[in-house]
């Protein structure tokens, strides 16, 4: 049945996601559906120091270790790690069950916590650009360490910000999962990158940036070395990509100036979100990087 002139024209479409190689369904009219979220819940109202916080300077963590009186970035191994270097071994007989339908292996790796700042009541967005860049530089040093670690193949750096996304401790921090395997989402992106290179001879990320700069309307922030935009193929509302303009496999090859540019764009984007929602805007932040297993990933 035709809906010509009914007002439904252009409301549904699917867009190709070049990194995931799958279709993303868009239904623009759903932006008008009711939204009952109470924005007051996102107001940041914590003390500068919380004596019960296991991340604040001088406090004792659950491991019994006491935090130093750190002045800026502080990094330590997670007291409740999701992976470890001394995970129990699994025999060949135990690896498979149900006629080899189910399979398991030991999970090896290193989990760390990165505190951005000693103050309990700030966010990464609240810091000045130089301080954010210092955080990124500390993460770069961690990446270099893991690249040289024989047990590590891939590193996931991520931050969950806001109680609404499941944060149990508001002290400004992110986490690092360095693992002995490469996550599937990274493998999919590497596959897409190689296919694009073979088909066009070009870097897929450079082509994404070029397309967004040509359209212009989805760009949120930009400077000489970095750019942020909501991509044409975004899967979620407000999903934002922050890219260095030059190709890099990871933070490892980015110089201090580029990290400062990345910090500047990050700060601009997150402050705009805070201003738009008149709140401390919650998010999930992930650093999308190539594995550190010695492979050639072409930038």
What function would you assign to each model-found segment?
Residues 264:
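Acidic, glycine-rich loop-and-strand cores that form catalytic or ligand-binding grooves
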Residues 1-171, 177-251, 257, 270-273, ...:
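Active-site microenvironments that recognize anionic phosphate/pyrophosphate groups
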Residues 277:
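Detector for conserved single-position "signature" residues within domains
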């Amino acid at each position: 049945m035709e809906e010509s002139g009914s007002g439904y024209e252009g409301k549904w479409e699917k867009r190709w996601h070049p990194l995931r190689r799958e279709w993303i369904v868009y239904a623009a009219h759903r932006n008008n559906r009711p939204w009952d979220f109470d924005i007051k819940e996102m107001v940041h109202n914590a003390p500068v120091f919380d004596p019960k916080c296991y991340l604040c300077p001088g406090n004792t963590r659950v491991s019994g270790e006491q935090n130093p009186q750190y002045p800026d970035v502080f990094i330590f191994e997670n007291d409740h790690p999701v992976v470890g270097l001394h995970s129990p071994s699994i025999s060949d007989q135990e690896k498979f069950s149900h006629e080899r339908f189910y399979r398991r292996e030991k999970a090896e790796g290193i989990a760390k916590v990165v505190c951005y700042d000693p103050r309990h009541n700030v966010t990464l967005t609240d810091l000045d650009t130089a301080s954010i860049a210092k955080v990124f530089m500390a993460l770069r040093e961690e990446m270099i360490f893991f690249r040289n670690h024989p047990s590590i193949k891939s590193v996931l750096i991520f931050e969950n910000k806001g109680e609404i996304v499941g944060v149990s401790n508001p002290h400004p921090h992110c986490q690092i999962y360095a693992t002995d395997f490469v996550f599937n989402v990274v493998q999919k992106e590497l596959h897409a990158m190689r296919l694009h290179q073979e088909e066009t001879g070009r870097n897929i990320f450079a082509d994404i940036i070029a397309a967004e700069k040509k359209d212009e309307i989805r760009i949120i922030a930009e400077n000489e070395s970095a750019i942020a935009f909501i991509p044409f193929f975004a899967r979620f509302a407000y999903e934002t990509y922050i890219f260095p303009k030059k190709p890099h496999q990871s933070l490892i090859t980015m110089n201090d100036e580029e990290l400062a540019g990345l910090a500047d764009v990050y700060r601009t984007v997150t402050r705009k979100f805070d201003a738009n929602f008149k709140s401390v805007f919650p998010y999930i932040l992930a650093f999308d990087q190539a594995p550190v297993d010695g492979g050639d990933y072409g930038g």
